[in-house]
From Swiss-Prot:
Pfam families: Cys_knot. It comes from Saimiri boliviensis boliviensis (Bolivian squirrel monkey). It comes from the Eukaryota. CDD domains: GHB_like. GO terms for cellular component: cytoplasm; extracellular space; follicle-stimulating hormone complex. This is Follitropin subunit beta. Disulfide bonds join C21-C69, C35-C84, C38-C122, C46-C100, C50-C102, C105-C112. The gene is FSHB. GO terms for molecular function: follicle-stimulating hormone activity. Together with the alpha chain CGA constitutes follitropin, the follicle-stimulating hormone, and provides its biological specificity to the hormone heterodimer. Binds FSHR, a G protein-coupled receptor, on target cells to activate downstream signaling pathways. Follitropin is involved in follicle development and spermatogenesis in reproductive organs. Keywords: Disulfide bond, Glycoprotein, Hormone, Secreted, Signal. The keyword Disulfide bond applies. GO terms for biological process: follicle-stimulating hormone signaling pathway; G protein-coupled receptor signaling pathway; positive regulation of bone resorption; positive regulation of gene expression; positive regulation of steroid biosynthetic process; regulation of osteoclast differentiation; regulation of signaling receptor activity; Sertoli cell proliferation. It is found in: Secreted. Belongs to the glycoprotein hormones subunit beta family.
Length: 129
């Protein structure tokens, strides 16, 4: 019985104290409306788990702020989209996370939805490698 209690307490400690929010490599689809196709690029973003809770009885006077794994610092990189027409602006700037933390989701710069389109979504039918 003591082993079960120890395992339970250890798992609770691990979940609370050891958030695994860290940098990870992802592939995103970038698209340019003037070029009418998408290309895939590799970048770095934040992923992992953060301690959070969802109360059964919600108090309207107390805001329920959920933490999420999000960037603490980021830089922007620019890539030239190949194959665009000469008159088109073929430069695309995208964010690259350099440091992560568990914090409130900032909807001004991040898709804070529960289930978004995903980083590899392309609104055009053509995807170039």
């Amino acid at each position: 019985m003591k082993t079960v209690q120890f395992c339970f307490l250890f798992c609770c400690w691990k979940a609370i104290c050891c958030n695994s929010c860290e940098l990870t490599n992802i592939t995103i689809a970038i698209e340019n409306e003037e070029c009418h196709f998408c290309i895939s690029i590799n970048t770095t973003w934040c992923a992992g788990y953060c301690y959070t809770r969802d109360l059964v009885f919600k108090d309207p006077a107390t805001p329920n702020i959920q933490t999420t794994c999000t960037f603490k610092e980021l830089v922007y990189e620019t890539v030239r989209v190949p194959g665009c027409a000469h008159h088109a602006d073929s430069l695309y700037t995208y964010p690259v996370a350099t440091q992560c933390h568990c914090g409130k989701c900032d909807s001004d710069s991040t898709d804070c939805t529960t289930q978004g389109l995903g980083p590899d979504y392309c609104s055009f039918s053509e995807m170039k490698e």
